[in-house]
Amino acid sequence: LNPNIADSGVGDVFVGNVHRFCSKFLFANGLVAAESSVIDEEDAVSILARYTGEDEYFVFGDFRRRREYSLIFHLESMMHQIAMGHPKALRSHTDCINGDDVKAMQRICSVCGRAFDAAAMVDIYNNVETYRDMTAADTADYGDRMIIQRLLQKMQLAQQYHRYKQQNHLLDFHDLLLLTYDALNADPEQSLYKRYTWVQVDEVQDLNQLQLAIIKLLTARSYRTVIFLG
């Protein structure tokens, strides 16, 4: 779009997709380490394959297995949203937690004598080994034990992926959105970060609810113009 903006002040206009804006926002405001790098899904698969022990090229070539990896990446980002109290409407790829996973968490909570709620989900996610030990002696039938094991394994892999990114200053595309949303949402007075009085969004139908929420948070409260095209 830049060549079509015939204005001497075009250098002050940001043109790009939401992920690119979020990356610029995070680095410009010192919200991530300066040496951080952004990774794509292929990089993410390579990282996770370190923990599964699988050949990453096998994963790339196997649609079913690659989808299972994607579900783990989505689980990592969704657990961040649950922990941070993001509205349910902003969560995407909710299929990363299926009916068996819910049943497994309910069973774990039953064994531990606690209510099944968001706090319990986050606690199980953050303490996989503890809950694995606590449920090891559970007398539930074989089927229930298997779904608990699968859930905890999936959560463990998501945690390992998360820690690897943190230790190596890596950000995936989910992180760009989540960290930007967190920062803007924590600045309700609009005093810490720049807001925009003119925002134009093209191909709005391609944006998910989290991206739209970020755009809303980026918009100044008064004297604003927001144009959505699609």
Predicted regions and their residues:
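Acidic-enriched, low-complexity/disordered segments with a strong bias for Aspartate over Glutamate
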Residues: 2, 7, 12, 40-43, ...
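Conserved P-loop NTPase-based nucleic-acid remodeling module centered on helicase motor cores
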Residues: 1-97
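Conserved ATP-driven helicase/translocase motor core recognized via long
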Residues: 56, 60-61, 71-167, 210
